[in-house]
């Protein structure tokens, strides 16, 4: 079952997602990537996180780009969830940044900058945006919020 559909408190969601951020950073430190770390692919019990449904085999050649994509997709999937506040999403990003290699965070930020034009191209559609597009808006806004703290 999709745990986001459960009636969890904000604090319970925060704990689960902070644990997931640490687990994703640990996965990346081991030279592994998920491919699409969506909320539905995260199992959690008593602080233990298990990722399921891996989408990609990591190759050394493009590992840094794959890690950056993993992190972006993880954040994007959080941003698509109406039930998650921007505060929780920013806390999760901070936790990943705290646990990852500094270059991994910088690679993700470089990817965001590379595709920034998409954000501006999509802004005129904000008033009619649905879940996927709102997720893109929130992704850029939350990353900017966390970047201000650097």
Language-model features: locations:
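C-lobe/activation-segment region of protein kinase-like
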Residues: 57-150
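Conserved kinase catalytic-core helix
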Residues: 3-40, 45, 49, 71
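A short secondary-structure junction motif
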Residues: 2-3, 103
